[in-house]
Amino acid sequence: DTWPSRPVKIVVPFAPGGTTDILARAVAPELSKAFGQQFIVDNRAGAGGNIGAELVAKAPNDGYTLLMGTVGTHGINRALYKSLPFDPIKDFVPITLVAAVPNVMEMNAEKAKQLGIANVQDFVKYLKANPNKLNMASSGSGTSIHLAGELFKSMTGTQMTHVPYKGSGPALLDMVAGNADVMFDNLPSSMQQIKGGKLVALAVTSSQRSAALPDVPTVEEAGGPALKGYEASSWFGLLAPAGTSPEIVNRIQQAVAKSLGTPEVKEKMQAQGAIPSGN
């Protein structure tokens, strides 16, 4: 049969509302338009992205199950877990990069105000005086969000209590509710809450400022000598099970590249703080 003759599933290995989910939902309708078949986002959260990634690694290589992979599922987890239920290189064929994304160091706005924290240096000062007083939410152990926070702790010699969630979506709900204090989230998932004033962005984790938040400094810029050289950013891309036909891979790659080039998708992504990067 000519691919696609039925709906195609894009597995997101995290809960709804996070950046992986936002990017998959930006690309899916464009692929549906390009191929005249539905591309459906399927959230399979857990184990820092490993559950969803394993599902795709073991799926038939017929082009009907794709993965929105991340620097976590295909980079970090290999170093973090003793054994993975899949091989991030051998079990997949990369289709295309979708976006590069800075993380943002953010606090619950009320909490920051209450503690008199207006910038990165205030934050470090508070932590030095109150070790482990603040809790640090993440999208799961070993995700880029978790490691961006750990890097910050190790460079500044500070301590926070790590609270892992099953994705940014649930972590953000607790951040907004004031149950979690600080997070180094991927910028797109937090953008709305920052713009709405629920969260305050102290810094971005990339080496340069983000065009989406031009007034927010980088961690390195705001943090003084202890944070010189600090940088943490993430990538997101589409992958298929190993052995998927090169023809299908090429067709998807071209359709994604075309959609990322359209002003509509480009602007949507950039407004969220993602940098579209089809290759």
Residue map of PLM features:
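Short secondary-structure boundary segments
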Residues: 70-71, 109, 187-188, 206, ...
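HAMP domain helices
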Residues: 230-231
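A ligand-binding cleft/hinge motif common to bilobed small-molecule-binding domains
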Residues: 74-83, 146, 151-155, 181-218, ...
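Hinge/capping helix and adjacent helix->loop/strand transition within the periplasmic-binding protein
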Residues: 58-63, 79-170, 219-221, 235-268, ...
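N-terminal (or domain-start) structured segment
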Residues: 1-90, 132-135, 141, 157-186, ...
